[in-house]
């Protein structure tokens, strides 16, 4: 995974998330939408063949937090949810 910043302002960030597709892009978008400081978030895959694993994101916040902080928090939430799934799976496997 590689992040390439396209445009950065105080309350807006546009970036490519190279190496990912709709699966992770949808997850990240949904988790960002849970943040009350995120006013807009969307992604697009500009060309389905040449850019299939390089979604372009736009994140806009209310200015109380930066888009970078919103992304950090979303990444933590995704990690914690994945850990919960792993823990639940380990309980099932052990029983």
Curated annotation (Swiss-Prot):
It is found in: Cytoplasm. Coiled coil: none annotated. GO terms for cellular component: cytoplasm; DNA-directed RNA polymerase complex. It catalyses: RNA(n) + a ribonucleoside 5'-triphosphate = RNA(n+1) + diphosphate. It comes from the Archaea. InterPro entries: RBP11-like, RBP11-like_dimer, RNA_pol_Rpb11_13-16kDa_CS, Rpo11-like. Gene3D superfamilies: RNA polymerase, RBP11-like subunit. Keywords: Cytoplasm, DNA-directed RNA polymerase, Nucleotidyltransferase, Transcription, Transferase. Pfam families: RNA_pol_L_2 (PF13656). Its EC number is 2.7.7.6. It is an enzyme of class 2 (transferase). GO terms for molecular function: DNA binding; DNA-directed RNA polymerase activity; protein dimerization activity. One of its GO terms (biological process) is DNA-templated transcription. HAMAP family: RNApol_arch_Rpo11. Belongs to the archaeal Rpo11/eukaryotic RPB11/RPC19 RNA polymerase subunit family. DNA-dependent RNA polymerase (RNAP) catalyzes the transcription of DNA into RNA using the four ribonucleoside triphosphates as substrates. Part of the RNA polymerase complex. NCBIfam families: PRK01146.1-3 (NF002235). PANTHER family: DNA-DIRECTED RNA POLYMERASE I,II,III, DNA-DIRECTED RNA POLYMERASES I AND III SUBUNIT RPAC2. This is DNA-directed RNA polymerase subunit Rpo11. It comes from Pyrococcus horikoshii (strain ATCC 700860 / DSM 12428 / JCM 9974 / NBRC 100139 / OT-3).
